[in-house]
Amino acid sequence: AVTVEIKDGGTSFVRITDNGCGMAREDVPKAILRHATSKIKTGSDLEAIGTLGFRGEALAAIAAVSAVRILTKRPEDEIGTLFVCRFGEVISTEDAGCPDGTTIIVENIFENTPARRKFLKKNTTEGSAVLAVCEKFALSRPNISVRFLSDGNPKLQTPGDGKMQSAVYAALGREFASAM
């Protein structure tokens, strides 16, 4: 399951939570490094990536212009990890109680780059763009439950039952799903 929560169109707050495999404590700082991944150890790993997550530059770019917290725990670990960085600088890494999976919280995007902040569109436009990404993700992975909330209001909820028609119904509506 993946839950995406935003406030103010995602310009002040984004929280993405999954119930996946989590990250090892030593891998968490790598998540904000450019061109780094903990998912690939050998060349043959490229053939077998079966997990989702931020790729390549994405989280590094986000971490450079915002405050980021990563809370993660693997099923085999007794305790999770809370990693905090602000504008690309590591603030802390500490033990934390949390469920299996990963939560990434992004706040105050572009606070340190006001010129970039000016290029953001209206909150409703930015929020609609986030919803569109969630819908596309839900349609591409009908076996994963996807939930999206904007300013506390549920906008999307798919069952994750593996049925394309269920995902289409949740993302695009009854009429579209009925036409399938």
Locations of regions flagged by a protein language model:
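N-terminal phosphate-binding caps/lids of nucleotide- and nucleic-acid-binding domains
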Residues: 1-180
